[in-house]
Regions:
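A short, Lys/Arg-rich alpha-helix, primarily the initiator
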Residues: 2-29
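Residues in the recognition helix of alpha-helical DNA-binding motifs
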Residues: 25, 39, 50
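Short alpha-helical "recognition helix" segments of helix-turn-helix
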Residues: 35-37
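Recognition helix of helix-turn-helix/homeodomain-like DNA-binding domains
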Residues: 42-56
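Helix-turn-helix/homeodomain-like alpha-helical modules used for DNA recognition
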Residues: 79-88
Length: 88
């Protein structure tokens, strides 16, 4: 399911941070928030907050960094999902 125009606009305007970079790549690849939640263990609300520039708490930092690397090395959401499944 594509991201809403509101989420896309908020993500593109927010200061670049770890969570915001995750959001920018998720939007670019249309990688679902529920999959980010599954991978990181964070709530969907937390993830949307990260997209908007909120700080990623230390408990989630490593999984967010790992997922960001997966998204950055993928050309499609499907490819990223396959890589996520292999890395778990």
């Amino acid at each position: 399911m594509p991201y809403s125009d509101k989420i896309i606009a908020e993500t593109s305007k927010a200061p670049k941070s770890l969570g915001n970079l995750l959001g920018r790549w998720a939007v670019k690849l249309d990688f679902p928030v529920i999959k980010i939640s599954d991978y990181t263990g964070a709530t969907r609300q937390s993830i949307y907050n990260w997209f908007g520039g909120s700080e990623v708490s230390p408990a989630y930092r490593r999984s967010v960094e790992n997922l960001l690397a997966i998204l950055q090395s993928s050309s499609t959401a499907e490819e990223a999902m396959r890589k996520c499944n292999k890395s778990k």
